[in-house]
């Protein structure tokens, strides 16, 4: 095997080693450090006093003093919580279908919390005016409601009348999932023109979160002028504000690993939008907001505008549905499928399709792996044949190297002539590896970022395919009463992966180059430690892929 091929393989191995090494030695310790920071921050937050309102809506960060005001209760199949009638704020929302962890008494996931709470996070829509003389509903307005409960079967109608007789009507509906629709109507019963602008905002108190560096996006996000905009919390903190003027805003919001809160404005006009950061009384806050152009409402006329709020789990089929139903461009990209989006999403679709039949995502992974293996069988067959031919040609290649050791150009010319004569492709042996790399990372992404894989069980001790194997050989898989350090958490599935990788190597043609052969012998051991902290679903895929490769190699050896 010539130096170019050796360098190619070495580059692939080095790249994988850097990526997995970064995950193992940097990301995991960083996550542990951040978990400690979260605990410290929570303790400090308990000592802080409640915050009062400091900034006007839609112009910056909004913090409102919470008081005992009337609320509209939210009840649906997916959500519970309430909407504050003071300022019409969505600030109390719990996701009924998701628990915080796998413990028996785990509470449900809370998404929104009132402004003065420890994890303040809320959304609101409303109206502002460039004239101070125009009396509009604001953060202190107490709305009147025709109902105390909002449900998919029962919309809520709100109203408020200012001192000039201008009537403001709001109709709120919620579907069975996570989408609120808010229709605002202004009936100008006064004798003056009303210049108004509609706005929407999502405001969040920053809390240290677990970050998987360069693996997924968390923070402000949106689709503006049909382009996906992603900003980390640090980006916005450094810039203080990122502004877009008179732009087409399909949606803007704040995303977590599994959860999304998003504003979806009316498509009737362009909007100015902002991604903001502010530090108030020692508290960091982030806000995304939009504001419409000025709309003049003449006396005796009325004006209506509709906007939506998505607040919930980032389910792939749900985001796809809303994207198609309401023409919300790139809404599915709120899920960070990564560089291999065109592969990752079809891989998820395939897994989800088979899950519909077998009811287990682990089994679905096994089925998809078989299909991928069958699709790649012809390529693998050619690859194994090429590797075998390369090994048989090695003595002749060595002879040519000795003969033309002082003439590099002639050496390469003679070797290429030999390849052509024997009909050997020197890179054919690398093709299955190169093809598997995007498939591998696609499955990793699916396991890591999709809500469908969160807390999805397999069989036996595997209760969450998106988490690492909870067992370790260093306490005899739980028989000994102690927990080894993180770097010794080498469970049954990482060991099975390493064993199957070793057996696969034994059945495959040994690389012709002695140095490469020595490197390959150590790969199962290296991968054992690197993969031990990865999602166990990925290890199930890799182990099963190795087993199928062993069967495939047996077939090729027998019939070729």
Curated annotation (Swiss-Prot):
Q: Name one GO molecular function term.
A: membrane insertase activity
State one Pfam family annotation.
Answer: 60KD_IMP
Its membrane topology, per UniProt? Multi-pass membrane protein
Q: Which cysteines are joined by disulfide bonds?
A: none
Where is it chiefly localized?
Answer: membrane
Query: Which PANTHER family does the record match to this protein?
Result: CYTOCHROME C OXIDASE ASSEMBLY PROTEIN COX18, MITOCHONDRIAL (PTHR12428:SF65), OXA1 (PTHR12428)
Q: How does it assemble?
A: Interacts with the Sec translocase complex via SecD. Specifically interacts with transmembrane segments of nascent integral membrane proteins during membrane integration.
Protein name per its UniProtKB record: Membrane protein insertase YidC
Organism encoding this protein: Rickettsia africae (strain ESF-5)
């Amino acid at each position: 095997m010539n130096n170019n091929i050796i360098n190619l393989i070495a580059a692939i191995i080095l790249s994988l080693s850097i990526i997995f090494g970064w995950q193992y030695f940097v990301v995991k310790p960083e996550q542990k450090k951040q978990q400690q920071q979260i605990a410290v921050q929570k303790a400090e937050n308990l000592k802080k006093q409640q915050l009062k309102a400091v900034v006007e809506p839609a112009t910056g960060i909004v913090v409102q003093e919470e008081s005992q005001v009337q609320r509209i209760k939210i009840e649906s199949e997916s959500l519970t919580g309430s909407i504050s009638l003071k300022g019409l704020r969505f600030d109390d929302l719990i996701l009924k279908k998701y628990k915080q962890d796998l413990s028996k008494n785990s509470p449900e996931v809370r998404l929104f919390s009132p402004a003065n709470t420890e994890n303040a996070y809320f959304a609101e829509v409303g109206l502002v005016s460039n004239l101070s003389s125009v009396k509009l509903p604001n953060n202190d307005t107490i709305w009147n409601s025709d109902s105390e409960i909002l449900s998919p079967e029962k919309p809520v109608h709100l109203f408020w009348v200012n001192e000039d007789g201008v009537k403001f009507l709001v109709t709120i509906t919620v579907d069975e999932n996570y989408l609120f629709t808010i229709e605002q109507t202004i009936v100008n019963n006064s004798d003056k023109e009303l210049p108004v602008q509609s706005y929407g905002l999502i405001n969040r108190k920053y809390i240290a979160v677990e970050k998987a560096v360069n693996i997924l996006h968390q923070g402000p996000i949106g689709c503006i002028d049909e382009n996906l905009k992603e900003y980390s919390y640090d980006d916005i903190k450094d810039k203080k504000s990122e502004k877009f003027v008179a732009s087409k805003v399909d949606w803007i919001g704040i995303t977590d690993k599994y959860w999304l809160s998003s504003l979806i404005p009316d498509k009737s006009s362009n909007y100015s939008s902002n991604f903001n950061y502010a530090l108030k009384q020692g508290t960091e806050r982030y806000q995304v907001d939009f504001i419409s152009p000025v709309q003049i409402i003449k006396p005796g006329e009325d004006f209506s505008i509709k906007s939506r709020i998505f607040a919930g789990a980032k389910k792939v089929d749900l985001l796809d549905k809303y994207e198609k139903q309401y023409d919300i461009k790139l809404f599915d990209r709120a899920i960070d499928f990564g560089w291999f989006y065109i592969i990752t999403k079809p891989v998820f679709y395939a897994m989800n399709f088979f899950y519909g039949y077998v009811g287990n995502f682990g089994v679905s992974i096994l089925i998809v792996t078989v299909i991928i293996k069958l699709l790649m069988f012809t390529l693998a067959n050619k690859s194994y044949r090429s590797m075998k031919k390369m090994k048989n040609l090695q003595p002749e290649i060595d002879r040519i190297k000795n003969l033309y050791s002082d003439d590099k150009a002639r050496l390469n010319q003679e070797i290429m002539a030999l390849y052509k004569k024997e009909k050997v492709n020197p890179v054919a042996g690398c093709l299955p590896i190169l093809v598997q790399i995007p498939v591998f990372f696609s499955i990793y992404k699916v396991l890591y970022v999709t809500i469908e894989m969160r807390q999805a069980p397999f069989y036996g001790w595997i209760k969450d395919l998106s988490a690492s194997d909870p067992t370790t050989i260093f306490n005899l898989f739980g028989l000994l009463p102690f927990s080894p350090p993180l770097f010794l958490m080498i469970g049954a599935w990482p060991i099975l992966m390493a064993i199957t990788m070793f057996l696969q190597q034994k059945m495959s043609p040994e690389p012709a180059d002695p140095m490469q052969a020595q490197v390959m012998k150590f790969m199962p051991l290296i991968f054992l430690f690197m993969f031990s902290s990865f999602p166990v679903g990925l290890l199930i895929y890799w182990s099963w892929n190795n087993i199928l490769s062993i069967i495939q190699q047996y077939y090729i050896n027998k019939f070729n």
